[in-house]
């Protein structure tokens, strides 16, 4: 049998507005993670174009995509990807030591409420605290865009709300552009704008008249 082509995204057209908090909502397999990977320069589309502030990334070299990710994009994933043998501060310094114009690693940890835990190792921290270290690491290089892929997916409700509160705080304090993907419809209420995906397509887009705080979310 021959190879079977699987289309992950179909006719997707999306503009992320500077300074907004965008939630991309969809079930597993809807294409939202693929879209986020393309937006972050981790993958390139087989057709269509991707641009960032007027610069075409569609046919960029690996070196240019690496530079784009390193300078302009902060990533937060469902699993924290922090190094167990390093303290919270040392994990954040992995980024600040190579970034062009980073904030101080201690400042990043203070922004996420871990000023008293910065010398702790991951094994001494809860799941929510480890995710906050991951957020601090992502924002420490002062990215133009923060991309969050199911940041509460491995957390219970109360811990998830705390992590969303940190993301909301970072969004407001740094005037950051945030795109957060989730399968959790309750999280959509904290967004400026919501994109719903199904089977690789955008099926709905709307703007929230008022945004809820993470503490007001129910799921």
Predicted regions and their residues:
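ABC family nucleotide-binding domain
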Residues: 1-191, 196-197, 202
């Amino acid at each position: 049998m021959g190879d079977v082509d699987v289309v992950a995204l179909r006719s997707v057209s999306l503009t992320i507005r500077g300074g907004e908090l965008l939630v991309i909502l969809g079930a597993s397999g809807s294409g939202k993670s693929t879209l986020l990977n393309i937006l972050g320069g981790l993958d390139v589309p087989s057709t269509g174009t991707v641009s960032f502030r007027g610069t075409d990334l569609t046919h960029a070299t690996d070196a240019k995509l690496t530079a784009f990710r390193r300078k302009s994009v902060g990533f937060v994933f469902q699993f924290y990807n922090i190094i167990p043998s390093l303290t919270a501060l040392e994990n954040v310094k992995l980024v600040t030591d190579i970034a062009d114009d980073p904030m101080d690693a201690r400042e990043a940890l203070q922004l996420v409420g871990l000023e008293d835990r910065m010398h702790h190792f991951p094994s001494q921290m809860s799941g929510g605290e480890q995710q906050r270290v991951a957020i601090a690491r992502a924002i420490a290089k002062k990215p133009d865009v923060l991309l969050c892929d199911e940041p509460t997916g491995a957390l219970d409700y109360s811990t998830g709300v705390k992590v969303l509160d940190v993301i909301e705080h970072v969004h407001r304090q740094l005037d950051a552009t945030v795109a957060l993907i989730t399968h959790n419809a309750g999280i959509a209420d904290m967004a400026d704008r919501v994109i719903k995906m199904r089977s690789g397509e955008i099926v709905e887009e709307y703007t929230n008249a008022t945004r809820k705080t993470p503490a007001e979310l129910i799921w």
